[in-house]
């Protein structure tokens, strides 16, 4: 399907684990799946001449959909409001996505687990854009990357009812 099509176009690296060569994609499949589902569910069908879009670059993937979000981008982790509730319900029934308000949480958890830079969520020209970055050395991350990672980690811990400490960060 669509997820496999996008995964097949992502840049990849080879790593050696336990003496076995393994191909690693720029970003994990769970991230692509959740962001594609969000782009489809939350698009504004009233805007004409535009549709969800996936752009693949050497260092990042940008998945966008038409329309400005109903919830501010800094509340994507803990807020939920869909403009297409019937479509969201249908996609949950078909197993394309899970319960409400869990997709962005999964994206951020996957990025943290794999030590990827924190995803960025933007609103540009009546489009909502999710940017997920490939691996980046901590020394090369700028201040905004680090602040975004701290903020998202803090909110995610709160949503999951976990304590945030220096060790969890």
Located regions from the model:
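C-terminal regulatory or interaction extensions
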Residues: 1-168
